[in-house]
Amino acid sequence: MHMGSEQRPDEIDLLLPANWPTAEQSAPVFLISEPEPKVEPQPFRRGGGAHALELLVALLALVLNAWRLDQNGFGNSYYAAAIRSMTHSWKAFLYGSLDPGSWITLDKPPGAFWLQALSARVFGYSSWSLLLPSAVCAALAVYLLTVTVRRVWGTTAGLVAGAAFALTPVVVAVGRSNNPDATLMLSVVAAAWATERSITTRRVRWMLLAGAFCGFGFLSKLLVAGLVMPGLWLGYLVAAKPPFAKRCLHLIAAAAVFAAVSLSWIAVVDLVPASSRPYIGGSTNGKALDLALGYRGIGRLTGATEFGAPGGGGRPGGFPGSGSLTFTVDEFGGTTGIGRLFNNGMGDQVMWLAPIAAVSFLAALASAIRRRTRDARLGSMVMFGGWAAVTYVIFAFINGVFHNYYVALLAPALAAFIGIGAALTRDAGRVGRVLAALSLVGTAALQIFLVHRVGTYGWVGTAAAIAIGVSVVGLVTTLASKRLTSRRALLSVGLAAVAVLIAPATWSFAGTTHPQSGTFPDARPSLPGGATGLPGGLGGGPGAGRGPGGFGGGLDEAMLTWLRAQQTTQRWIVAVSSAMQASSALIAGDSVMAIGGFSGSDNTMSPARLAGLIDAGELRFMMTSGGFGGAPGQGSGLSTVVRSTCAPIPAETWGGSGSSGLYDCAGKSAALRAAPVPAANTSQAPANTNGGPSNPGAFEKCMQDNGAPAPTGNGPGGVNINDPAIARALAACAGLFGGGGSFPPGAAPAN
């Protein structure tokens, strides 16, 4: 394969001077390479030792992701509930419906969940079948990154990049959950692989395939997939061989493919009449386009929040925490700023090797400037550099809803530069070896800080520092030699790679030893006593070892047994306010309607529409605890109508005690249609700007009355929101929060 001898940069190139030499004509001297190794993609030789090692790295990733996978239960209960429903009917599968009756969908396109639902259909619905697709996707992403880096920078670089990627804790975490991030990660890495293929083969079809891969990433997690596209597109623009005008046309075509794939599901959904399909969760008008461009799309970047509408299961906020641990994690990203990704929640998940990645980028940039050549290495450097820069800046300063595990999207680019750094160090001159040694020293300091900040596994920091120190000494002792021999170079690079991966590997392996949160996946040693906090100080449960599942509250099992016995022709056995109340029942196979979607804020129901469902025999029972979702005022208004119109079911009827909040609306359709919808009742809960309960004493009593331990202090500090009893109590007590009987805007734990 020829990289520069057949065609010079065209004369109309607007990015690089037309007189830049080709790779074979350029001066080979640069900052850390004396001479520069030949820039030729290394062919893929099947059956070779390098191929076996690449597969071994991918296998390591798969083992890490799949080891004791069933201890994580069903992962994120919100998504697990939808997967159960998607196995029930192909209609639910197509739309990504939360419930088997297809009343409302998930608040994301179903791309990633199609894979999980297919797995559940083939292997049966179980913990393994739900979580295995993510494990496989993460392992495939590792393999593709290894190949992508190896083709341009050599076998050593590819293997080091793959190992660094596989052992990044957040990669292991998302690979062991049913969140869509592993599928997104595979999609964008595949797009980078296709982009690199397009640059080296000079075939535009690979660039079109890159657009398609990014499009599927959009179908998995909306616009976040677009964060990698500027880097990929710019890498092709500066390094591909066709004339500049053709390159631009190629990128326009790739963007068109991206748009076509991205909008395919949106078009299919929105062309179907609203009466014939489920409401699109997370939208303001029931349309898929609004989901993509609204709160869940552009709103995530601008800081927009969804309605904190009446609904159960949300996360109260605005209180000081009461925990005594020194290491706490804000699962919502913490304070914005340039150092955000080094905070407690993200630093030990993705930033272990940041100094090496930064120095490697600068070295690769210097190489490109010195060589003045448009080739595959320039494209690779720009592609991964743009990916890392755009993603880091957006994640550091985004004001919208943000979770720590989102940084998995940054991991492939950082790992690529670890591999690139290994290649440059292997072929480096004296100056390059000095820079490599300095980057190792910086990495050792960072790793010691990250380990000791957590307050456990302190020996890991010491061991990593010693190993890195030995590798630094090894590099320094070679300075007397102008060049490294091949054997000494590989030994130096290999020792350094092993040394810097000790700490992240320990964190990754530790993450497999105990159950992980389905809602907030991470990989780190189990922290005794609980060390995970939420904004406003809502204390965590059992720390990083918290049990599987999400915020699922749930319906009492005795109540569900009674409701099942009452079901005749009804499509839904009961309607509740939010997915957090419905998830456990949906996972068990019951058809429960979550009127307000994820957090109870979707406006899907009115008294008239409820009356129509009752007349059609599709719904009979309503659960009013926590109110029903909708825009401000409408949810609590519907709850008021149901309470005043339908017949209450005493808890003793189904073997419970206290107030059940269950109502029988059979035969009440006429009264429901005639009932006025009152405004939200704010007299008992005046406006509260900080999102806390207007009457903490009443909130504490409400929690106790609903079977939960009393929160301490001035808020719910120290409670475990993954405990179903706690979640049910929070749902029942939502009316004591400001804003008309609702959680404050953005307080419900957005996913």
Tell what function each PLM region has.
Residues 276, 284, 514, 604-613:
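Alpha-helical scaffolding within the catalytic cores
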Residues 79, 111, 128, 191, ...:
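Stable alpha-helical elements in mature extracytoplasmic
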Residues 44-48, 321-347, 545-569, 691-698, ...:
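Intrinsic low-complexity, intrinsically disordered segments
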Residues 2-435, 442-446, 510, 598:
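Membrane-integral, polyisoprenol-dependent glycosyltransferases
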Residues 3, 428-529, 553:
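Transmembrane helical bundles and short interhelical boundary loops of multi-pass, membrane-embedded
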Residues 88, 120, 172, 514, ...:
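Sec-exported extracytoplasmic/periplasmic mature domains
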Residues 675, 679-751:
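Cell-envelope/extracellular polymer assembly enzymes that use nucleotide-activated donors
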Residues 502-600, 615-641, 646-665:
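Short periplasmic/luminal acceptor-recognition loop of GT-C membrane glycosyltransferases, typified by
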